[in-house]
Every structure is written in structure tokens, then in C-alpha cells.
């Protein structure tokens, strides 16, 4: 491993504040070099927003950085330690196949983690090889960028590099490394790790770092600033999970190590988007009991946040009973905050600007009709946007006809015009989502044929989900019956 000195001016501007934290929270480790790195996809617009030159990033020396073969100046590679409740069971974890290069400082002073996923073994790899297969890395690229375009807080994908090496899973697969960009990789599980294995001073150091990085508006001398940290994280997660529900996104593995403190969606292993509306929808092959089903996600969010509150207890009050009382009061606010964001989002999807007491029943009645008649979630709301009742597949159902009349009457009680409602719905109801069969089609072409054009076309369509353009229609079609039920795998 060598420090890279010959790369053209890419624009790397690394800082390494995470290394100021107690050493128990990370291990210094360099990426393992790969045989023949090749850049297969680069996110030009994200690169530019980070202050990086997309042309220079395609230079061979820059590709070596993205592959982990060279370390850029100022970087301090490390793997982060964390814990987590995985399907409800607590375990000590850590970055087993991901290495944080450092924090990129953008031209406007923002700070983003730059992480290489699939870059080799770390002290936390256990029995893993530290590597990643091409398919799951491309999948994360597609889904994370689609989520960003949908306006949902998420980690981002800067690039995918193939390694020229094979990884061995159920079959032999081409290896790859994803460059992931995040506001940070601090998780609920990070706090759980320190609370279980560290001292109160180490926990305080992590909390202070997190407040400074993500919530600088919380003053250092504020009374009980750690309670403010809990409040801020609850608020962000309530809003995030509401946004998931509004587009039919199913994370698939909502373990506490996959809940970020920043409020970004992270870890796209077994995730997928719901086609037919059903609250019990599960895609993950390992979620055999439906713990992380679509309809359970809000409740799991509350459960995870309760684990975060438990980790913070020593900082909330000297008296444990008082600390528990404070934590419980904040956790009890989560459900109301979630419903507020979800209800406002559903109103927007139906073109409603103001609030009425019957709105919740109007929304739930529509969802019940959709569930009963197996209507597509995304396409139903898109059809309502353009008043194309036949496109819903519900137009000949009496329950829907009666509901539609109620909805029209509700719209008529607003000051806003029908055009206003139509425009609000266009901005709130995507024409396209990353349909599972379309994602698989793109991955199959890339992995099996080294054809990235299918993926590039898909990414182009997904980049403007609210455009409602003619070319998006083909990507809005449902999967063939033979593609159902769809199953996802974590890719590890």
C-alpha cells in the first residue's frame, strides 16, 4: 500500500475527526489491494457536489484510490466498531468489509464520510472475506440514488469499481468495491457498542462528537444536551420512516446497526419497493417471521429508538429512575411525530392542502380498498394524480367509486383549485420507482454480460421520478407473474 502522490487534481480534502474519539471505537486498517481495478460507474453530479473532478476521478491513479490500492493524501483509513440488535438479538459487530478513508470537506464546508465497501478484511470481519460481489454493490448504487431523487435522506454512491477478482458465495461472482458517501456512519449501534463496552466518559465523548457534527445548534452549555440529542434523532427517524412508507420502500433489515444518527437511510442489502399494496409485504429471504414487513417499519423504528435511549441513560440523569423517566417520555412522542409526517405526506399524495378531522379515515379507507383488490401502490396514486380511474384497476369496484366521491367532495372544500391539487400530487406521487424486476434486469446485464447500458437507462429514468414523462411508462409496468414473489438477499 502506498500513499498516492501522482493523482491529477481530483479535489480530495480529507479531515479525520473520527480518529479523535477513544480508540475503542475504531481500528486503524488499510484496504487490501485488488488485482485489476476497473471503474464501471461514476456519479458525476455527486462528485462535483463533493468538490471532486469527475474527469480526474477516471484517471488510473484515482481508480486505484477507489479500489483501495492507494490511499489519498490526508486519509486515515479505519474500520468502525459498533454493536446491534439483529432481528431482536444483541451482538457486537463492526465494519467487517468496509473501510472509512476519512471525511471529505466540500468547497462549502460540509463534511461527508468516504467509505470503501468491499475493500478487504478488518478486525471485525469474523469469518468473512471482507469482499463484496458486483451485483449487490450495483444494487446499492441504483437504490440509493433513486432514494435521493425521491427526496428521501440517504447515503449516496459515488462509484463502483470491479476488482478483477472473484468472490465466493453460493456461486463464484465478480468482486467489486462501492464508494459510499454519508453524512456519517454513526449508528444507534455505535452508541450501543460504547454503552456496553466502554466507560461513561467514552460514551460522553461519542455523544459530544455527534452533537457537534450533526446538531451544532445544540449549544455546548445547554441544560441536558444529551436529552436534546435523543429528541433530535427521534425527530429525524420519525420523518425518515414516514417518507419510506409514502413510497412503499421496505428496508428489509432494520437492525439497530442500520439506523443512522444522521437520519439517512443506510444499508440497501435486502431492501425493495412494494408493488401491490399489502402491509405484510416482506422481500428479505431471512425475515421469515415478517419482523421488518412494510406495515411493521414504524413500530420497529420506535423499538430501535428505545434501544438508543437505553444507551444514553447514563448521560440523561445521575439517577437511573429519572433517566428512564426522561427517555420514556421522549420515546412516547415518536408515534405522534411519525403520524404527523405520514398523514401530511398522504394528504399531499391526495392533493389536500389543509387538515380535516376525517382525513385519516379517508386515507385508510383507500388503502383498505387497495389491499382488498391488490392494487399497485405507486400506480394507484399516479392514476389518481391524473384522474385516470381505469388505470387504478379499481374503477369497477363499488367501494372505490364511493371513496372517489368522498375524495372529490373533500377536494371541493379547499380554497385551492383542482390545478393546484394536481400540481401538488405530481410533486408527491412518483411516476416511477426502482421496480424490482427492472433492477434485476439491469444487474443481470451488468454482471453476466458486462453491459451497463441497461443500468444507465434505468438510472436516467429514476433520476427524475416526478417528471411524469412518456419514456417513464415502460418502467411503471408491473412484473410478470413469474417474477412474483420477489426475494432479496443481503449480499454478504
From Swiss-Prot:
Active site: 257
Species: Halalkalibacterium halodurans (strain ATCC BAA-125 / DSM 18197 / FERM 7344 / JCM 9153 / C-125)
Protein name, per record: Protein nucleotidyltransferase YdiU
Family matches, as Pfam families: SelO (PF02696)
Entry similarity comment: Belongs to the SELO family.
Molecular function GO labels: AMPylase activity; ATP binding; magnesium ion binding
Keyword Transmembrane helix: no
Residues annotated to bind ATP: 94, 96-97, 117, 129-130, 180, 187, 267
Essential cofactor(s): Mg(2+); Mn(2+)
Binding site for Mg(2+): 258, 267
